[in-house]
Regions:
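Acidic-basic catalytic patches of nuclease active cores, encompassing PD-(D/E)XK
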Residues: 1-36
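Conserved catalytic cores of phosphodiester-cleaving nucleases, focusing on short active-site segments
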Residues: 17, 43-74
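Short, well-ordered coil/turn elements that cap or connect secondary structure elements
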Residues: 26, 79-81, 105-106
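Structural motif
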Residues: 33, 55-60, 87-90
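Hydrophobic beta-strand segments of well-ordered beta-sheets in folded domains
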Residues: 50-53, 80-87, 109
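Short, charged, amphipathic alpha-helix that recurs within catalytic cores of restriction-modification
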Residues: 64-89, 93-99
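Domain-level recognition of nuclease-like catalytic cores that cleave nucleotide substrates
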Residues: 90-114
Length: 114
């Protein structure tokens, strides 16, 4: 989520994720997203009649339980037809994929290396 003290690296990842949304043909890309279920995702876009949300994460974010809790909140709060795209640095893609598998999030989250 976009916070008051966004790091330069997180800002770069958030903007890269918004650009990726555009290159995938999604429309009405916004960053930050509109609030949804008491959360403010980093990016939002339209894909036909559905909304796609995006979260930018850094490699070090996966060493904290806060990230798991935040993703659990997204998966539990967003309607099942909504998709969450997780933008991460390519360098940590295998590690993050393992974490998502262990946490049971692979069915609701699309991982994108940026």
């Amino acid at each position: 989520m976009v916070g008051k003290t966004e790091s330069t690296e997180h800002e770069r990842m958030r903007k890269a994720l918004a650009t990726w949304f555009t290159t995938q043909g999604l429309s009405n890309v916004k960053t930050p997203a509109d609030p949804v279920a008491d959360m403010v995702p980093d990016v939002q876009a339209d894909y036909f009649a559905k909304i796609v949300y995006g979260e930018a994460k850094l490699c070090e974010d996966f060493a904290t339980p806060d990230t798991k809790d935040e993703l659990l909140n997204y998966c539990g709060s967003l309607p099942s037809e909504y998709k969450l795209v997780l933008g991460i640095p390519k360098a940590c893609e295998p590690t993050v994929q393992r974490a998502l598998t262990e946490w049971g999030f692979t069915h609701r989250i699309q991982l994108v290396g940026l």
